[in-house]
Curated annotation (Swiss-Prot):
A single GO molecular function term of this UniProt record: structural constituent of ribosome
Alphabetical list of CDD domains matching this protein: Ribosomal_L30
Protein name, as recorded: Large ribosomal subunit protein uL30
InterPro entries reported in the protein's UniProt record: Ribo_uL30_ferredoxin-like_sf, Ribosomal_uL30_bac-type, Ribosomal_uL30_ferredoxin-like
Pfam family membership, one: Ribosomal_L30
GO CC terms: cytosolic large ribosomal subunit
Keywords: Ribonucleoprotein, Ribosomal protein
Coiled-coil intervals, chain numbering: none
Family the entry assigns: Belongs to the universal ribosomal protein uL30 family.
Assembly mode: Part of the 50S ribosomal subunit.
Record-level GO BP terms: translation
C-alpha cells in the first residue's frame, strides 16, 4: 500500500498569478470543492506548497 494525498480546491483561482493557476491545472483542480487523489511524492508536495492557501490536503491510504 502506498500513501496518497486527497487535495481539495477551497478557494477560487480567479485573480491569482498564472503560475498558481497552472499549478492547480496541473494537479487536475478546476472548480471549487473538486477533489483529486494523487500519489504522495516530492513533486506533488512542491505543487501543494505553491498553492497551500487555495487548497486543503489530507493523507489517505491507497492501494495501487
Amino acid at each position: 500500500m502506498s500513501k496518497q494525498l486527497k487535495i481539495t480546491l477551497k478557494k477560487s483561482a480567479i485573480g491569482r498569478p498564472s503560475k498558481q493557476r497552472d499549478t492547480l491545472r496541473g494537479m487536475g483542480l478546476s472548480k471549487i470543492n473538486k477533489a483529486v487523489v494523487l500519489k504522495d511524492c516530492t513533486e506533488i508536495r512542491g505543487m501543494i506548497n505553491k498553492v497551500s492557501h487555495l487548497v486543503s490536503c489530507e493523507e489517505v491510504e491507497g492501494v495501487e
